[in-house]
């Protein structure tokens, strides 16, 4: 059974032709109230993105995700693999936030905050307008033969795109290996850091491919967030929507005619100018309703408002609204489902904040040496050998470290007399614990150990002490 002509858009995407070839999108340069606000938000976020790797707090990079060395800085606070439980909680909160936010506000994130949209629409697209001109000029340039003008414009655009992609790749690398290390590599030159330079070129090629060729296909094909809409959106979700009740009315949309009483004639307020289609960065017609390709960028809102103002009709034909708002002309309602998500999200955030505040400055792990049994000492004393690992999560050296038994009478002998843990480093070694066997209750006893810096207790940990089966 074939779909009606009006429903064809539901069975295909706007960026692919009927014969399966790429349909290049040439959106008209947007302008308007929402676009101006998006520029402010976008350039603010871009500024944060580009300067964050070079900001230091207490000697720590503001944000660093060094997977190779397993060192992470979030807002200037160092995190280690031992803090992985915090990452799990954060990811869980992030997933729930995406669900909660999408249920309530659709893909507003995509249009306002997503790095792909910001770079594509506020950086690369604006460069394209500057070099090649607006929609009409770009279409004519694409159809034109490869003459001197076309070669000149395309080469200039490709060079500028490559330079910006290279710059983005450098910033991306600064997040991965640290800005200090990146600057050192740049001063030394690629000759001495060939693997890093090759990685930089690979990142550059990926960014260039995404923004020069793949472009809006990322949002339409590659990004899983768009696919979630079908599961998460309902008729109460706020999206960029066309008010079909007002736009169509009894006789549907029609071209604008001066001095015509559209209300009396039963014509809708939509004058079928197609400006909302021409300005769309993914090439859809928002009048067909919510679609997979829509990133809620508001370009169609600005274009429609501009046309409504010119023809003397009320603005808001395309606006932020839900299906229920348009159908029943009601206001946004905080549904029980949203309330449930909010409660769960609030609890998880409270747990995460609590765990961050209770996070210790030092991580201690003391484990019995594998394959080693206990050893009899003088009198009734039993000795076990252990390995210790101390991770200093702070920017200060921890000096004069000592170990003391808190749960049993006995003593601890460290192989190295002096233990110091440098800032953001770890210290490892061996120690012996000696306890009177008469104090042991089981074959394997839990013992509590205190780690001190001078006389100050900085951490406690437990380990298993092995003794004989009989204590008589």
Give names to the regions the model predicted.
Residues 2-249, 301, 314-346:
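Membrane-embedded alpha-helical bundles of multi-pass integral membrane proteins
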Residues 350-374:
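Hydrophobic alpha-helical transmembrane segments in integral membrane proteins
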Residues 381-387, 428, 442-447:
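Short, solvent-exposed loop/turn segments enriched in Ser/Thr/Gly
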Residues 102-117, 211-226, 261-308:
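Cysteine-centered iron-sulfur cluster-binding motifs in ferredoxin-type domains/subunits
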Residues 395-410:
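Short acidic, flexible loop segments centered on an aromatic residue
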Residues 390-394:
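Asparagine-centered strand-capping/turn motif at beta-strand->loop junctions
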Residues 413-438:
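Intrinsically disordered, low-complexity Pro/Gly/Ser/Thr-rich segments with frequent PxxP/GP/PP motifs
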Residues 436-472:
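Terminal connector regions
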């Amino acid at each position: 059974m074939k779909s009606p002509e009006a429903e064809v858009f539901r069975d295909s995407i706007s960026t692919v032709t009927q014969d399966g070839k790429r349909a290049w999108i040439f959106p008209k340069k947007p302008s308007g109230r929402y676009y101006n606000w998006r520029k402010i938000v976008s350039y603010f976020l871009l500024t944060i993105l580009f300067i964050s790797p070079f900001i230091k707090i207490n000697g720590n990079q503001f944000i660093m995700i060094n997977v190779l060395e397993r060192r992470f800085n979030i807002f200037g606070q160092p995190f280690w693999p031992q803090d992985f439980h915090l990452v799990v909680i954060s990811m869980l909160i992030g997933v729930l936030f995406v669900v909660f936010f999408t249920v309530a506000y659709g893909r507003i994130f995509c249009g306002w905050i997503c790095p792909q949209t910001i770079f594509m629409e506020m950086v690369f697209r604006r460069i394209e307008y500057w070099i090649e001109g607006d929609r009409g000029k770009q279409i004519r340039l694409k159809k034109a033969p490869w003459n001197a003008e076309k070669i000149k414009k395309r080469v200039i655009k490709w060079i500028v795109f490559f330079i910006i992609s290279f710059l983005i790749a450098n910033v991306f690398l600064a997040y991965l290996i640290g800005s200090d290390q990146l600057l050192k590599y740049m001063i030394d030159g690629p000759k001495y850091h060939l693997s890093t330079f090759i990685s930089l070129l690979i990142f550059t090629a990926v960014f260039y491919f995404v923004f020069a060729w793949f472009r809006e296909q990322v949002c339409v094909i590659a990004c899983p967030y768009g696919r979630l809409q079908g599961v998460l959106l309902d008729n109460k979700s706020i999206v960029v929507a066309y008010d079909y009740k007002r736009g169509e009315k009894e006789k549907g949309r029609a071209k604008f005619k001066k001095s015509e009483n559209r209300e009396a004639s039963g014509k809708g307020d939509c004058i079928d100018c197609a400006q909302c289609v021409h300005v769309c960065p993914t090439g859809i017609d928002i009048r067909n309703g919510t679609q997979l390709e829509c990133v809620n960028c508001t370009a169609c809102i600005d274009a429609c408002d501009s046309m409504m103002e010119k023809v003397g009709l009320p603005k808001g034909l395309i606006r932020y609204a839900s299906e229920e708002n348009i159908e029943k002309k009601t206001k946004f309602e905080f549904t029980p489902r949203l309330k449930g998500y909010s409660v769960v999200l609030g609890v998880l955030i409270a747990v995460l904040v609590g765990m961050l505040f209770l996070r210790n400055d030092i991580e201690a792990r003391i484990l019995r040496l594998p394959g080693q049994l206990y050893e009899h000492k003088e009198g009734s004393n039993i000795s076990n050998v252990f390995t210790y690992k101390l991770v200093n999560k702070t920017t200060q050296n921890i000096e004069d470290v000592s170990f003391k038994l808190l749960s049993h009478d006995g003593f601890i002998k460290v192989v190295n007399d002096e233990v110091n843990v440098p800032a953001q480093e770890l210290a490892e070694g061996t120690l012996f614990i000696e306890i009177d066997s008469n104090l042991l209750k089981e074959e394997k006893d839990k013992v509590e150990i205190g780690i001190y810096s001078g006389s100050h207790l900085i951490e406690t940990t437990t380990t298993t002490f092995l003794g004989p089966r009989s204590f008589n």
